[in-house]
Design a protein with these regions (language model features):
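Solvent-exposed soluble domains appended to multi-pass membrane proteins
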Residues: 1-200
Length: 200
């Protein structure tokens, strides 16, 4: 585990090639992962293990392009096993998708209540997430944000890879409805059914 939160702590035995602390922690993370996998390969359990690497959140890269910068929520997910054929997927997903994706790789049947999908078997038409006071819904071309404090809706066209503010119209309604229905469902599970009961 490593953090991109200051203060940046690099072990004294590690000698980075770069001078910027933010780059040094990336160098150290890369080195530490290499060391970890070199040692793991020597273990008898290596070929029977699925390794999952992911970030919990991103970091502001460049200028904030909107009220909730996408770089805060754009995180990597890497799944590795010596028994899995390498491939790269560039479709988006969420942290809720990790569990069903791993269970799918293991061919394990499961009862699932966390709104995730198996990213290797289906593509998400859209995704929602929350951060601070914002609710966000997005797909490949549109970004919908709702600020709870100001009760303001913010809408962007992201189809060309850049965020362009556009007026709210009917094309954003599926994102809005999906995002709020997911939040309401989660709240219902927590308050009414109680998530502890789902574990039984």
């Amino acid at each position: 585990s490593i953090s991109n939160h200051p203060p940046y702590v690099i072990p004294p035995f590690f000698h980075p090639k770069t001078s910027e602390p933010e780059m040094q922690i990336v160098e150290y993370a890369d080195w530490a992962l290499r060391q970890f996998f070199e040692e793991a390969r020597k273990q008898p359990w290596f070929d029977n293990t699925i390794f999952v690497l992911e970030g919990d959140h991103g970091k502001l890269v460049g200028d904030a392009e909107c009220e909730l910068p996408e770089s805060y929520n754009h995180i990597p997910l890497m799944i590795y096993s010596s028994r899995i054929q390498p491939e790269e997927k560039t479709t988006f997903g969420g942290q809720v998708d990790i569990q069903p994706t791993i269970l799918g790789l293991l061919n394990i049947d499961y009862l699932q209540n966390n709104f995730g999908v198996d990213l290797l078997k289906e593509e998400r038409p859209c995704m929602f997430y929350t951060a601070d006071n914002m609710v966000v819904g997005r797909n490949d071309t549109l970004l919908y944000l709702y600020n709870y404090e100001t009760q303001q809706e913010l809408t962007y066209d992201i189809g060309n890879g850049k965020l362009n503010a556009v007026p709210m119209d009917d094309s954003f309604l599926p994102l809005k409805e999906y995002s709020f229905s997911m939040l309401q469902s989660a709240e219902f599970l927590v308050k009414q059914i109680k998530t502890d009961d789902l574990k039984k």
